[in-house]
Amino acid sequence: MRNQKWIALLGINLFSAGCNSTDLSTSSGGSTVATSGGTSSSFSARPARIYSAALTSCNPMGSGSTSAIDLNLGIAARLYYSPAGQPEYTDVESYMNDGTDLGVDIFFNQVNVIPTYFSAGFPSAAGPPFETPDGSVLMEWFGIRYKSTLRLTANDQPGNYQLATLSDDGSILYLDPTGGQNPVDFVDNDGSHATQMACAKSTLAMDASTQIPFQLDYFQGPRYHLTSMLLWRRVPDGASLSDPACGVVGINTFFDTTHTPSVPQPYYESLLSRGWEVIPAENFVLPDTNPENPCFPGGGILGI
């Protein structure tokens, strides 16, 4: 059911520039999705769009610098909310299917919102935070749909990569490495919960030509703390995909939220020592629906 709704929402175009795949294979450490043979985008041929500063937000939610690192890199996102009179949804699909699109554009360099006390809402590039039609600043009961294309850079080794999410509240990562218009729930971390890690049960076979369009749907329930992080690790051939952190949940397990900003706990640092990392900003290419990043300094596409 999720796959059918996802296809209906996105249509054909999201994956038209996706990678081609050869097969699905299984190793002792879990299944591996082969994704070699992907196509490259011609960034210079993609048309520019002028964005309104009042309706655009750059790296909100305490996710780092407000500037993009490159005109064609980043993650485009849309913001959904539950208007007065509608339920306070506790799952991702309800926000995407039944929530209201606020009509704003959000850009992230990467998915790296560590556990954060979120009370100021989403600041626009013009300064004031976004408001719903009734004048409310969104601090709770909202959903975010991230879209981008995942790739390796020249600094990354080809191989099998396992993905994971850390989120508070729920999130679902969808992707279609086969290029067959069949996106799947690749990492399911849905539901109302404190910061929780969910891990993919299969790996992605990636090389320099691989480009994988993806969508990450996330929702925030009751105020104030939230988390939204996308991680990966390179897995040696035949290695197990099990990790002690997969499925672990806790308010202060991964980060100490009594500090501002939150401080990594030894449990999170041990996760990094096992090869996990937040996917770097250089690995995200903007989708064709938002080909240029208005948060890039000097890009000339962020209006007033």
What do these predicted regions represent?
Residues 1-7:
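Bacterial N-terminal signal peptides that target proteins for export
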Residues 8-17:
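Bacterial N-terminal signal peptides
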Residues 16-45:
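Bacterial Sec-dependent N-terminal signal peptides
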Residues 43-304:
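Acidic/polar, compositionally biased interaction segments
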